[in-house]
Regions:
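Cysteine endopeptidase catalytic domains of the caspase/legumain-like
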Residues: 1-240
Length: 240
């Protein structure tokens, strides 16, 4: 997603990149400094400007970043207003709730963003007028639990790789490296946007749904967002 935004013309000042950044120079990486999601694909780490590493942030810090609360520890925050469209891509691990749904997004070994906390964050951002529209694209197990809490928040749309009760699956296998490199949700997302940056949200959801294997791609809060047939990714990828 970072590369797609850069290709669309956005500067690093318009992007907040939070990753652990523990792959490129990992001792077992046969190509130091290189991160790919397919054999022979481009080096996604090259030129990337990392704002924060996940291990350096708490989930409270994450909420402060979303709500524009700048500090010495958090110099880079979301400086948005009610006229801005905000795109969030989250790829990681998730856990189920006690009842199998409405779980959490794992943040670190000892921290997580619960569905309830995510819902509170969305409602607070909405009440403070921090976005015109906000699109969440979440690739994580049980991510539908977080998607559910977006219901009722005006202008928020959430598309998840799995429903609240199931895991999402890896898909892109490297025979050379003997590791899973990506997943069908993310690879389809990238291919769909790269081939048509103005793709409608309906068509994007449909492509994700039919191509993602092993889990059910879900979409939440459509009634409070707008027409999925006329609303497009162009609202997020086209420079103002």
């Amino acid at each position: 997603m970072y590369c797609l935004l850069k290709a669309a013309g956005y500067s690093d000042d318009d992007i907040i990149l939070i990753i652990e950044d523990d792959i490129a120079y990992n001792s077992v990486n046969p190509q130091p400094g290189v991160v790919r999601v397919s054999d022979g694909g481009p080096n996604l780490r090259e030129g990337a400007v990392v704002d924060y590493r996940t291990s350096s942030l708490t989930t409270d810090d994450l909420c402060d970043i979303f709500l524009g609360r700048c500090s010495d520890r958090l110099p880079c925050v979301l400086d948005s207003s009610q006229g801005d469209n905000v795109l969030v891509f989250w790829s990681g691990h998730g856990s189920p709730g006690d009842d199998g749904g409405s779980g959490c997004l794992n943040w670190s070994s000892d921290e997580e963003l619960s569905a309830d906390a995510a819902g509170e964050l969305l409602r607070e951002a909405s009440s403070e007028g921090r976005f015109r529209k906000m699109l969440w694209l979440i690739e994580a197990c049980y991510s539908g639990g977080v998607g559910q809490v977006s219901e009722g928040v005006p202008g928020v749309l959430c598309i998840t790789a799995a429903d609240p009760y199931e895991t999402s699956k890896a898909d892109v296998w490297s025979t050379a490296l003997q590791v899973w490199m990506s997943n069908r949700f993310t690879s389809t997302l990238h291919e769909s946007i790269a081939s048509n940056p103005e793709i409608s949200l309906r068509d994007l959801y449909y492509r994700l749904f039919i191509n993602t294997v092993g889990s059910h791609v879900m979409i939440y809060n459509t009634a409070n967002y707008g027409s999925l047939y006329s609303e497009t990714l162009g609202e997020y990828l086209a420079l103002p």
